[in-house]
Amino acid sequence: MQGTPDYYDMINIGFGPAGIALACALEEAAHRPLETGQCLFLDKHPNCAWHPEFLLDGTDINHHLLRDLVTPRNPQSRHSFAMYLKEHGRLYQFGLLGRPASRNEWSDYVAWVGKAFASHVHYEEEVLEIRPVTEDGEIQLLLVMTSRGQYLTRNLVLSSGSTPNIPSQFEQMDCARVIHTSRYLSSLEGLDRQAAWAFAVVGSGQSAGESIIDLLNRFPNAQVTSIHRSSGFKIAQLGQFPNQAFHPDRVAYFHKLGQAEKAMILEEVKSTNYSGIDVDESQALYSLFYEGLVSNQPRLALKIFTHIESASQTPDKLILHTCDPYTLERSSVEADYVFLGTGYKQDYVPPLLSQLQPWLSLGSDNGVQVEQNYRLTTAPSFRPAIFVNGLSERSHGIGEGQSFSLLAMRAGILTHSLF
């Protein structure tokens, strides 16, 4: 180690929407902790683009525009979506649009807010390791080791987002031909648009459905096989009453429940955020399916009640070995490329905390225990504070998953706890 690492009162890992919302809350706090220069945000990416690999034409956000980075916490914030529209001269025009913001526009909004904090962010700096610093028999500080240097802190916030969910059958496969939707657009670069590709898409949620529509439109001679463990695509629960699951008041109720009760509630409300598509997407998918029947040239095949038992590959094909769990009939699907619309997962213990695990309190599910203010429960001899920002669905409810619903409110709670 050359010299003493720089010290920061807070280091936040990840500068996507959760990290940006925290920066907004810190800036707007009465004591202005950002102005002291003692808050550092680290991100391994070159910018703060929101889902850049899945910004597909014709797609829009599936939450209300008031659930932006700041409005639920501070409706007067300069970082609201309304202020973004005003700054770009589109406020009145957007009011006439009659539909949600497009995903491209929402990504531009997120980037617009992120740019306001450029002086506090180190982009393209990946956190490699976090080590405990011991003094007088206790852990006093954390040493954050990155691709560029080292830093010390007493307060660490993980805003690093969820991990792509890769089913075990595909973990050892050629990643150039088995593609999670988190790598979707870049994986298509260089593919012949006119070739008669055989694509397989795994999953029953929004990303799977949107992938199918895009592939069929982008590659007019391609065939797509849509593979589902269940009975196929279903409409997500978009009604007002089911979506009260995302209300901030539900967090305290959910947090005090036992692990078994939490699991039951998550199972009950998952259709509000997972494994569902919206009405427009369902209509588009079925239209593509039906047009194939009319023309007698079907390009979309649906395989329901299909469990992928294993996958293998030849020099030029991927082969998915499947089984119907009810009839036990086995079959196979051959494809040039397999796209995984299988969503994301939250690790029970974030990998970056592996060296700190001896001091972390684990629950009955062997996951980190998260207090209501998002601080991890640690041993008495562990003095630093570690907070999770968007990684606490199992402890706080479905609003803490892949959703903007609680971003702003959570950022306010974190700011109060940190400073």
Where are the model-predicted features located?
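Short, solvent-exposed coil/turn linker segments
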Residues: 33, 57-69, 180, 324
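Charge- and polar-rich, low-complexity intrinsically disordered segments of small proteins and propeptides
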Residues: 47-49, 72
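A short alpha-helix-loop-beta-strand transition element characteristic
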Residues: 53, 74, 94-97
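N-terminal beta-loop-helix "entrance" segment that forms/cooperates
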Residues: 50-58
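Tryptophan-centered motif/residue detector
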Residues: 50, 81-84, 112
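Flavin (primarily FAD) cofactor-binding/catalytic cores of flavoenzymes
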Residues: 1-46, 95-206, 210-231, 235-419
